[in-house]
C-alpha cells in the first residue's frame, strides 16, 4: 500500500507483485497447459529485471525471454538451471557465452549458425536453437520461403538441436491479416512434418494474440510481455476480456505552491496563460523521468483523487499543475502520475506513445519499491 512514508524521495516507483501474480494467473487460465516464456527484455519493461525474474521463478515460470546477453548472464548466475531464449542475435564475440551459459538463441541465417556450430565444436557441446520465421514483420527472422533449407540443416547438425519453431505477429489489431499469417505459419509446420522434422516447441503468441485469439493446439508455448505488466492490446472496437492490473505505479509530491495572477504565463515559451487568478503546484518530475513533453498544458495528475491539469510545458525535472480552488494541497502532498486510478492507458492515448515506450522510459535509471 502506498503512503507518504513509502516515498523516500521526490519520485517513487512502486512495483505491485500481487498485481503481477494476478496477471500471471489470468494468463495461465487462458492458455491451459502451454509453456510460458516470461518476456523480461528492456529491464522487464522498466519494472526491474532481477526482482521480476525472482518473483516469476518463485511462481514456477522456467522460461524467460531476453534480448541482451548481459541480462542473460546475470540471471544465469542467479540460477544456472533456468532456460533463457535469446530473441535477437548476440554479438560475434559473445557466442562463446551463448554456449557456456546454455542459452537458447533464435536463429534465422546460416552465418550465425556456422559461428554457433564452430564454437560448439571448440567447447565440445551441443546447443538448442529456435528457428525464427518471418511471416510479415520484416524484422529479425528468415523468410518463410527460405526456412525449410535452414530447418533441415539444423535437424542434421551434430551440434544443433532444433528445439523450437517460432514467429512474431506484427498486426494483432487486424484480424484478417493475423489469421492469414497464422495460416502461412501452420502450412510451414505441415511441411516440416512431411520432412520428419518435429520441434518440441511451436510458438507465435505474443500478448495481443494470447488475449484476443483462440490459440491453435499446435502452439504449445507462448511469450507474454505487456500483459504480465498489466496492459493489453485489443482488437478494434473490442474491449479486453480479462481484467489485467497495472504492476507499476509512479508517485511524486508537491514541493512548492504559489499563486499566479490572471494574464501571467507559465513555463517555457509561455504556452499557457492564466485566464483567472489561480494556484499552482510544482512537481519534481519531468521528461527526464519519462513523462512525455507533448502532454504539456492539458493532461493531468491526481492529487487527493482530484484531477490537477498540467499548465505550461513539462520541463526536464519539473512539471507545473493547476490546483483546483476546492482542493486543499500542501507541500509534501502525494501526486499520482501512474497508478491503478490513473493507468498508463490514459497517458498513452493522450501522448500517442505506446505503453511499451512509456513504461520503459518511466522505469529507466530508477530504484523501485517492491510490494507484495
UniProtKB/Swiss-Prot annotation:
Stretches assigned to coiled coil: none
Any one Gene Ontology molecular-function term assigned to this protein's record: alanine racemase activity
GO cellular component: cytosol
EC number of this enzyme: 5.1.1.1
Pfam families recorded: Ala_racemase_C, Ala_racemase_N
Enzyme class: isomerase
InterPro entries for the chain: Ala_racemase, Ala_racemase/Decarboxylase_C, Ala_racemase_C, Ala_racemase_N, Ala_racemase_pyridoxalP-BS, PLP-binding_barrel
Keyword entries, A-Z: Isomerase, Pyridoxal phosphate
Pathway participation: Amino-acid biosynthesis; D-alanine biosynthesis; D-alanine from L-alanine: step 1/1
Co-factor requirement: pyridoxal 5'-phosphate
Keyword Isomerase annotated: yes
Cysteine disulfide partners in this protein: none
List of catalytic residues: 41 (proton acceptor), 268 (proton acceptor)
A Gene Ontology BP annotation from the UniProt entry: D-alanine biosynthetic process
N6-(pyridoxal phosphate)lysine: residues bearing it: 41
Catalytic activity: L-alanine = D-alanine
Amino acids binding substrate: 139, 316
Protein task: Catalyzes the interconversion of L-alanine and D-alanine. May also act on other amino acids.
HAMAP family, per database record: Ala_racemase
NCBIfam families named in the record: alr (TIGR00492)
Sequence similarity: Belongs to the alanine racemase family.
Protein name: Alanine racemase
Protein source organism: Borreliella burgdorferi (strain ATCC 35210 / DSM 4680 / CIP 102532 / B31) (Borrelia burgdorferi)
Gene giving rise to this polypeptide: alr
